[in-house]
Amino acid sequence: MVCYKQVSIYLGEDKTKCILFTKKKTHKQLNICNKSAKIKQHKTIDYLGCILDNNLSGEHMVLKVLNKVNSKLKFLYRQSEHLNPQLRRMLCNALLQPHFDYASTSWYPLIKQCYKQILQVAQNICIRFCLGL
């Protein structure tokens, strides 16, 4: 018996996603059905702003963070002639740093060393922008 029926929870099949967390690169497809609708299994899901992949490598989340930070940093560099150092630092703290910090305890320890270095380079670029170098 499925427990969500016992507590009268409606399960929207079109929004419901299934993911199997495993270290193996290849794994069996789960066959989960609700009445007649089959729930699709995904390799990555977006949950509360974090991208979780089936092997918890964190690579997709790193790429998302880098994309957001780089796009905002390009905009700030275009406006840099109008910004004093104090305002630059405030904008970096308000617009860029939250992307590095958001849920980092869940994805940062699991990423490969090469991604950690790429994130460090991105943070160094942010610091150079703050200092006007």
Regions found by a protein language model. Name each.
Residues 36-107:
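Basic, alpha-helical interaction scaffolds
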Residues 113-133:
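A terminal-accessory region detector
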Residues 2, 9-43:
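Short, conserved micro-motifs composed of acidic
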Residues 10-14, 110-117:
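Short, glycine/acidic-rich hinge or "gate" loops at secondary-structure transitions
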Residues 21, 55, 122:
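Structured beta-strand/turn binding interfaces of compact recognition modules in eukaryotic regulators
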Residues 2-5, 9, 78-81, 101, ...:
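Charged/polar positions within long, soluble alpha-helices
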